[in-house]
Amino acid sequence: MMFRLTSVGCFLLVIVLLNVAVLTNASCRNEGAMCSFGFQCCKKECCMSHCTDFCRNPDKRAHGHGLLRFWGQR
């Protein structure tokens, strides 16, 4: 019984240590790599699902005002 508990404990410890090793070796994603959140990128900027230095897209509010201006002319 003791041997079985020790074996299971050692097995779980190895799994935990391997997970820690993978997490510490998993570095951030470089520019151009796919991302979902900013913390995944080295420069902490995820824009349109890609890591970038800064988001090169126009501000959404400015784009919305352009649409309102377009509809106002009709």
UniProtKB/Swiss-Prot annotation:
Superkingdom per UniProt: Eukaryota
Segment forming the signal sequence: 1-26
Pfam families in the cross-refs: Conotoxin_I2
Keyword Disulfide bond (UniProt): yes
Cystines in this chain: 28-42, 35-47, 41-51, 46-55
Cellular compartment(s): Secreted
Main subcellular location: secreted
Propeptide residue interval(s): 62-74
Name this protein carries in UniProt: Conotoxin Vt11.7
Organism: Conus planorbis
